[in-house]
Structures are given as C-alpha cells and as structure tokens.
From Swiss-Prot:
Family: Belongs to the FtsB family.
Organism: Shewanella amazonensis (strain ATCC BAA-1098 / SB2B)
Sections of the chain in a coiled coil: 38-75
Name of this protein: Cell division protein FtsB
Subunit-level organization: Part of a complex composed of FtsB, FtsL and FtsQ.
Amino acid sequence: MKPFVLVLFALLALLQYRLWFGENSLTEYFTLKDRISHQQSGNAELLERNEVLKEEIQDLKSGTEALEERARNELGLIEQGETFFRVVGNDSRSIRSSEQSQDNQ
C-alpha cells in the first residue's frame, strides 16, 4: 500500500509542477489574460478613432462647410473680399522684463 501512495504523491507533484510551471501554466494563463485585456482596450480606442475619422470623411464628402473650415484653419485661406487680421497678444515675458527694467530705474 505504501508504494501506491508514493506513486500517487509523485503523480500529484508532477501535475502540480505542470500546473504552476509547465506549458500552459497558470502564470502563462494570467499573462495572456492581461495581454488580451490590454489589446482589447487598444482595439476599443482604435475603433473610436476610426469612427471619428469616418464621420470626418463623411462630413468632408457631403458638404462644403467642413472643407472650408479645414482650409481656413490648416491652410490659412481666406475668401475673396475678406481681410485677414492677426491679433498679437502681449507676451508675459516681455511684460515682466519691462517691469523689471522699470524697477531697476
């Protein structure tokens, strides 16, 4: 009876080793599960991006307003008869340097 128990114990140890450290082990399972969840979240982000791009393409194909807006923003185009004004704000560094020069006087 004792050799039978030893064989069963050895078999159990072998199966436990395969479960924890062998091919398709629990550590590999959890690693793959984590990689799958990361991949799925990346896929979801890409799907959202694709939807935004599809909407933008549809908007550009269907109307001239989006095309005109894009030309104005990205290319700086203006319509005939329009006057372009560039508003230049005060730079905070130049204000500080002028305040410092006034303090030094």
